[in-house]
From Swiss-Prot:
It comes from the Bacteria. This is Anti-sigma F factor. The gene is spoIIAB. Keywords: ATP-binding, Kinase, Nucleotide-binding, Serine/threonine-protein kinase, Sporulation, Transferase. Its EC number is 2.7.11.1. Binds to sigma F and blocks its ability to form an RNA polymerase holoenzyme (E-sigma F). Phosphorylates SpoIIAA on a serine residue. This phosphorylation may enable SpoIIAA to act as an anti-anti-sigma factor that counteracts SpoIIAB and thus releases sigma F from inhibition.
């Protein structure tokens, strides 16, 4: 059971990445996070949305990215979903420095950043059907 929930949907334009991270940060502000915690969440959301745009939709601006954020007992769950091309080998793409787009000079650190800044990361994907990234972060609630 969640205490609060938000859903957001937008087209896969790179300009919307900043909007997504600010919207999620504004929503979790109700937990009174530290500046570092907000920065961690914004960075993780930015990486996931950027992956959807660049890899899932291959920079095509007609895809849809969905974000669902739930707060329950001081824990935030963020799901970012696309209906893009999917990931064939999830363990491979989660290796640090691996990139499927060296032509774009991508660093291959997106999933590593998400794992580092969040308390939990789960990636589910099906080829040609899309990808869902689920991230969790626990916040210390002051009474």
């Amino acid at each position: 059971m969640y205490e609060n929930k938000m859903n957001l949907e937008f087209v896969s334009k790179s300009q919307n990445e900043a909007f997504a991270r600010v919207a999620v940060a504004a929503f979790i502000a109700q937990l009174d996070p530290t500046i570092d915690e907000i920065s961690d969440v914004k960075t993780a959301v930015s990486e996931a949305v950027t992956n959807s745009i660049i890899h899932g939709y291959e920079n095509k601006e007609d895809g849809i990215i969905k974000i669902e954020v739930e707060i329950c007992d001081g824990e935030v769950t963020i799901e970012i979903t696309d209906n893009g091309k999917g990931i064939e080998d999830i363990p491979k793409v989660m290796e640090p420095l691996y990139t499927s787009r060296p032509d774009l000079e991508r660093s291959g650190m997106g999933f590593t950043v998400m794992e580092t800044f969040m308390d939990g990361l789960l990636v589910e994907s099906e080829k040609e059907k899309g990808t869902r990234v689920r991230m969790k972060k626990k916040f210390n609630i002051l009474s």
